[in-house]
Amino acid sequence: MKLSRKESVRRRHQRVRRKINGTAERPRLSVFRSNNHIYAQIIDDVAQHTLAAASTLEATLRGELESTATQEASAAVGKLVAQRALDKGIEQVVFDRGGNLYHGRVKALAEAARSAGLNF
């Protein structure tokens, strides 16, 4: 039986998470993508603590964006999460694509975070 798209994403995410882990020195930039929104968190897995977060649900972004499900919206979230991380002194991160392919909205978020100053 063929796997559903959701199950494929879940399995890929498990494979990715086995290989990467965020620390206090190099936390994990985790991306979750839904049909309408995108969420990014910077997580210290050792302390199990979220250090910075951003999403298209935030009021500051919603006013600026025409749609929350576009690459432009993802890029805005990437810039915002990078800005918040840099304000807290975080420059190095490990990228966790969350089981999604590195393409489209996930790629736009990653490239915007890189251009805003995060290294990964």
Swiss-Prot record:
InterPro entries listed in its UniProt record: Ribosomal_uL18_bac-type, Ribosomal_uL18_bac/euk
Keyword Cytoplasm: no
Bias kind Basic residues: ranges: 8-20
GO cellular component: cytosolic large ribosomal subunit
Gene3D superfamilies linked to this entry: 3.30.420.100
Record has Nucleotide-binding as a keyword: no
A molecular function (GO) term: 5S rRNA binding
Biological process terms in GO annotation: translation
Region: Disordered, residue numbers: 1-23
Superkingdom assignment: Bacteria
Key words of the record: Ribonucleoprotein, Ribosomal protein, RNA-binding, rRNA-binding
Entries under PANTHER family matching the protein: 39S RIBOSOMAL PROTEIN L18, MITOCHONDRIAL, LARGE RIBOSOMAL SUBUNIT PROTEIN UL18M
Function: This is one of the proteins that bind and probably mediate the attachment of the 5S RNA into the large ribosomal subunit, where it forms part of the central protuberance.
Similarity comment text for this entry: Belongs to the universal ribosomal protein uL18 family.
HAMAP family, alphabetized: Ribosomal_uL18_B (MF_01337_B)
Subunit (UniProt): Part of the 50S ribosomal subunit; part of the 5S rRNA/L5/L18/L25 subcomplex. Contacts the 5S and 23S rRNAs.
Protein name (record): Large ribosomal subunit protein uL18
